[in-house]
Amino acid sequence: MSDIEAKIRSAWIGRISGCQLGKPIERMSMRDGHSALHDYLSDVGPLPLRDYVGYKEGYDIQKECCRGFLSRSEPDDDINYSFLALLMLEEHGRDLSTSDVARTWLKRLPAAQTFTAERAAYKVLLERGKEWFPETGNAGFDLSACSDNPYNDWIGAQIRADVYGWVCPGNPELAASLVTEDASLSHRGDGVYGAVFVAVLGALLMTHTPAEALRTAKTYLPENSGAIIAVELAESLLA
């Protein structure tokens, strides 16, 4: 196994296991807030977490994703986008366009598995797109309307981004180009910048040290953007 293949395998494992780690309590954190989440985690196991989340009766969490009950990777909307990215790259390669992403969503992505910016973009595609757009031709309207939504600077496009980096080892420019086509369907500004950062970082980590990859990936973010501020804040917390 080559070094790059080993890194890609590890990236897949990290992607899926990380998703499963947070999945049981995802709704709790959004519904009940940080304090309730912290209390639950403190009750079922020591913090900081060093294993999957434990299960306790009486809480509305996904038992099948908890420590002691895991038998597989449970379906998740975040992982769906990783597979969609692979499908689109297999079909379109370097020529992937935002229109291709829109068609793929309509043909392969259940509407009920979209949320926030993606749901808003999907709704516009259904309402304004030509009936036969998923099969051929143009959408019949300017696709930039899909990203005109209240969530377009949220992290959804970042969640969709990592595969574009993995398949471009040592080629951050191509990774940035591909992920921009995908991200632009539903996001703008920092929503796209964050996705570019994730994809570029993934491409660079295949051939560079983590420190080198991070340093170079930051150069793809506009100065004073929310994305660069967030990255530098994270760095400061590690200092």
Regions of interest found by a model, annotated:
Residues 1-239:
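Structured, active/binding-site neighborhoods that engage oxygen-rich ligands
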